[in-house]
């Protein structure tokens, strides 16, 4: 961001986003959570459209705002139904009120999941996330890796006692939507040539893993024992770390080569050794190679999936293998393939020094 116009504006928007996200996490009831949820959406819109002189950035920010608002309508209706029948917005309402509500509570929780699916870019509401890469790369690292896009996963996890007791079939829906999203996004990531779009579809796929982990953890599956819930939250934390590292590495590379296209890169390990090492570590982590963090969180998710259903277990294993394929395709294309375009040595060194 050095030398960018609107530096103060960037930090103002970033502070608003951080405040909104912290508020969402510490909210003590579902309505308070919704207020901060919407503030996160507004600050995301402002950050994605930071380069407001670029038509692509303006279009991307509008797309993200409209798609997530559409999903949030479902979230709001779900909150209102829940509040009416539970007679409170608390995360821990009286059991008698929920039992008396009958099928309305599963309906409310299903609608809340629609809101979470929009924020977490689940199929078919995933369309905004790849375009959201128009924002500054540090924003991509924070919003589209570590925090905002996993807000939907956090929502399902926060309401988890209600899901597991009153809407276990909705959790199955969460698992199936997550599995399809993970497979679809991984297959698209395998053929992308834009470095940030590969990471965007990778993020969608990994969020699918988290949703599957939560979804397979139901009272209808007595052998599960809460492993899926723990694994989903564990993967949320590990993914935040290695995906933020990947995005910051991508920003360093883009700054050096002035292009997002992998065709403009190749052989950069000689010119950007620090970026090369950090990017490799993040690739090993997301691919699930031991002893990196991704191995432990994905291992727990796959264990939970196999306990739920062997079919689900094998599907997620294939998707994990696809993750390793597209990440090492990206890594090889950037750092080891034959160099296709000139990169200024001074520029690469400047970018490297920024790491120190």
Where does each model-flagged region fall?
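Short phosphate-coordinating micro-motif centered on Lys-Gly-acidic
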Residues: 38
């Amino acid at each position: 961001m050095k030398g960018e116009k609107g530096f103060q504006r960037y930090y103002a928007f970033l502070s608003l986003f951080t405040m909104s996200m912290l508020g969402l996490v510490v909210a003590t009831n579902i309505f308070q959570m919704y207020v901060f949820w919407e503030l996160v959406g507004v600050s995301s819109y402002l950050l994605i459209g930071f380069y407001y002189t670029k038509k692509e950035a303006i279009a991307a920010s509008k797309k993200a705002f409209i798609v997530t608002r559409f999903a949030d309508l479902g979230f709001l209706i779900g909150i209102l139904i829940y509040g009416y029948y539970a007679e409170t917005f608390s995360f821990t309402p009286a059991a008698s009120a929920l039992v008396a509500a009958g099928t309305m509570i599963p309906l409310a929780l299903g609608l809340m999941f629609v809101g979470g699916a929009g924020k977490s870019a689940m199929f078919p509401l995933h369309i905004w996330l790849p375009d959201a890469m128009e924002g500054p790369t540090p924003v991509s690292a924070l919003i589209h890796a570590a925090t905002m896009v996993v807000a939907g996963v956090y929502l399902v996890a926060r309401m988890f006692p209600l899901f597991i007791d009153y809407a276990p079939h909705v959790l199955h829906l969460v698992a199936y939507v997550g599995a399809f999203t993970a497979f679809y996004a991984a297959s698209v990531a395998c053929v992308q040539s834009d470095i940030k779009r590969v990471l965007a579809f990778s993020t969608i796929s990994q969020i699918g893993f988290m949703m599957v982990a939560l979804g397979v953890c139901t009272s209808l599956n007595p052998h599960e024992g809460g492993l899926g819930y723990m694994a989903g939250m564990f993967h949320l934390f590990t993914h935040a770390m290695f995906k933020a590292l990947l995005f910051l590495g991508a920003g360093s590379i883009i700054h050096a080569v002035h292009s997002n296209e992998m065709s403009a890169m190749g052989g950069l390990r000689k010119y950007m050794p620090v970026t090369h090492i950090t990017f490799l570590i993040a690739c090993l982590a997301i691919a699930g190679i031991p002893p990196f963090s991704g191995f432990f969180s994905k291992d727990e998710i796959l264990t939970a999936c196999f306990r739920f259903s062997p079919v689900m277990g094998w599907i997620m294993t294939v998707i994990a293998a696809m993750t390793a394929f597209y990440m090492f395709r990206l890594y090889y294309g950037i750092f080891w393939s034959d160099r296709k375009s000139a990169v200024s040595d001074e520029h690469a060194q400047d970018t490297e020094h920024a790491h120190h």
